[in-house]
Swiss-Prot record:
This is Elongation factor 4. One of its GO terms (molecular function) is ribosome binding. Keywords: Cell membrane, GTP-binding, Hydrolase, Membrane, Nucleotide-binding, Protein biosynthesis. It is an enzyme of class 3 (hydrolase). HAMAP family: LepA. It comes from Mycoplasmopsis synoviae (strain 53) (Mycoplasma synoviae). Belongs to the TRAFAC class translation factor GTPase superfamily. Classic translation factor GTPase family. LepA subfamily. It catalyses: GTP + H2O = GDP + phosphate + H(+).
């Protein structure tokens, strides 16, 4: 295979700018998929992706155009899946930057461009949706030059929906995307694992980009991140390329993107970003991997039925295979039993995983309220990281608490600037800068505590700006905050699943909300139940679940009032005794409804 005929590129764009539709048109025009077989969002293989209209997983396909071989790697566009994008870019030489002609540059476009520049990729600007009446191509071109600094004289104007301009785009890929000319089949094998997925019959299937060397069926290989021994020896059973369905081959050459099956059964044996090499002629050094991504949102996952605990563990193992950004460990809760503490890249990421567990693995779960990882400085000089409110050390042993902060960049129409600033202030934001992009839009930068943005910030921002704002963030480190742990007591008993960590100024507000929610959800008992929120033993909010009362005076008619009072007194004493020994059963539905995040409640409306 001639190396100068290989063109490997990724498609990057903000969510909803037409990335998957353009991928469909490219598949159609290169005759990779016939029009009859082509469905919308063809490369989005998960049902969930098609339903929500978003890409979640990356996908890699080999196509033929004239006498060239195109290797297209489709990427997600949502801020939570930036890690998937960075992996695709590390396996590419070029990137198509898609910008919606009606919306212009959005926050996520910018984030992905910086990733492409970091990876030293050739970027081709593509202006999509030019057929729409509201398209303003000249303004968007100007914006690309001003904000990103890429010349737009070679920008391609297309309509992914109708197919207009896509043929010009294919020629531009041939002209501008570099070929892997340094790829050499004779050098020792170096192949980058940029993704993996689980097949119930073949085990783990690796998606690789061969940078140097050649890989054949029957070859023995190893992972370079681990020492070579018996447990790090694998045989290639099958390999091939995707176009878009799997096509088997006898070998893969340098420069190619393909898949490899080697009867790998354990998900933990693989880390995405690793390099594979031959055992008999190993490479001297591994390829530069990816910077390890850190989970930022943590939540407890507990099976609804305790019998499903093992199944939940196996499902998490399988999902972590294709999504190496998830971290999880076992934990227990007095109220919910055995479960796992799971770390995610963001709330959408968490929601998607919950749905995947339910659909693909048939495991129903209760998720506790999401939280972030706090840095606790103790009086004895120790530093502890805590993501679970129940693990918070005693207040008397804490010197100070720091929480993670993000730098949020928001692109917004000028008329909504006031609304957005008001929202950021209410979330304890620190104003950094405001920059006008043109006479219609501006870029605002704020520093915000991550804990304030993980619940409802995104939804509120959309409603404050009628859906026109776009948001992108990066972690900038930890800052000291005045944080407290709020515990919930039911009938004087602490319920660990409802504990939260909140800022002192907002603790009362959160505690009050939670008490009211609990009062509405927990069924009435035969005795009165106090629902209390406490900070370090001090009660800050209270609600009461009223008791059922039997009408003990029904059998009386007439007579002295003292007879009535005597019976009521007797009932009161009985209830008091019952309250002392009565334990409260919190039904499963109550847990589910109380612990549901705002997104779930919004969907219910």
């Amino acid at each position: 295979m001639q190396k100068n005929k290989i063109k490997t590129f990724s498609i990057i764009a903000h969510i909803d700018h037409g990335k998957s539709t353009l991928a469909d048109r490219i598949l159609e025009l290169t005759n990779t998929v016939s029009k009859r077989e082509l469905t919308n969002q063809f490369l989005d293989s998960m049902e969930l992706e098609k339903e929500r209209g978003i890409s979640i997983k990356l996908n890699a396909v080999q196509l033929k155009y004239k006498d060239y071989i195109f290797q297209l790697i489709d990427t997600p566009g949502h801020v939570d899946f930036t890690y998937e994008v960075s992996r695709s870019l590390a396996a590419s030489e070029g990137a198509l930057l898609i910008v919606d002609a009606t919306q212009g540059i959005q926050a996520q476009t910018l984030a992905n461009v910086y990733l492409a520049i970091e990876n030293k990729l050739e970027i081709i600007p593509v202006i999509n949706k030019v057929d729409l009446p509201s398209a303003d191509v000249d303004r968007v071109k100007q914006e690309i030059e001003d904000v990103i600094g890429i010349p737009t004289n070679s920008a391609i104007e297309v309509s992914a929906k109708t197919g207009f301009g896509v043929d010009k785009l294919l020629d531009a890929i041939v002209e501008y995307v570099p070929s892997p000319l340094d790829a050499d089949d004779l050098k020792p094998l170096k192949a980058l694992i940029f993704d993996s997925y689980f097949d119930p019959y073949r085990g783990v299937v690796l998606l690789i980009r061969i940078k140097e060397g050649k890989l054949k069926v029957g070859d023995k290989f190893m992972f370079m991140s681990r020492k070579h021994d018996e447990s790090n020896t694998y045989h290639v059973i099958e390999l091939g390329v995707k176009n878009p369905s799997e096509t088997k081959k006898e070998f893969l050459e340098s420069g190619e993107v393909g898949w490899v099956s080697a009867a790998i059964r354990d998900a933990k044996e693989i880390s995405v970003g690793d390099t594979i090499t031959h055992i008999d002629n190993p490479a001297k050094e591994a390829l530069p991997g990816y910077k390890k991504i850190k989970a930022v949102v943590f939540t407890g996952f507990y099976p609804i039925d305790t019998k499903d605990y093992v199944q939940l563990k196996e499902s998490l193992e399988k999902i972590s295979l294709s999504d190496s950004s998830i971290v999880w460990e076992q934990e227990t809760s007095k109220a919910l039993g055995f479960g796992f503490r799971v770390g995610f890249l963001g709330l959408l990421h968490m929601e998607i995983l919950q749905e995947r567990l339910d659909r693909e693995y048939n495991v129903g779960i209760i998720a506790t309220a999401p939280s972030v990882e706090y840095k606790i400085f103790k009086t004895n000089g120790e530093i502890e990281f805590v993501s679970n409110p129940t693990m918070m050390p005693d207040r008397s042993t804490i010197e100070k608490i720091e929480e993670p902060y993000i730098e949020a960049t928001v692109f917004i129409p000028n008329e909504y600037i006031g609304n957005l600033m008001e929202l950021c202030q209410s979330k304890r934001g620190i104003y950094i800068s405001l920059e006008a992009l043109d006479d219609k839009r501006s870029k605002i930068v704020y520093e915000l505590p991550l804990s304030e943005t993980i619940l409802d910030f995104f939804d509120k921002m959309k409603s404050y700006t009628k859906g026109f704002a776009s948001f992108e963030y990066e972690l900038i480190g930890y800052k000291e905050s005045d944080l407290v742990k709020v515990d919930i007591l039911l009938n004087g008993e602490k319920v660990d699943a409802f504990s939260i960590i909140a800022h002192k100024d907002k603790a009362y507000e959160h505690a009050r909300e939670l008490c009211i929610k609990l009062k509405d959800e927990i069924p009435r008992q035969n005795f009165e139940i106090p629902v209390q929120a406490t900070i370090g033993g001090k009660i800050i909010a209270r609600e009461t679940i009223k008791a059922y009362r039997k009408d003990v005076t029904a059998k009386l008619y007439g007579g002295d009032v003292t007879r009535k009072q005597k019976l009521l007194k007797k009932q009161k004493a009985g209830k008091k005794r019952m309250k002392k020994i009565g334990s409260i059963e919190v039904p499963q539905e109550a847990f589910l409804n109380i612990l549901k995040t705002n997104t779930d409640q919004k969907n219910k409306k």
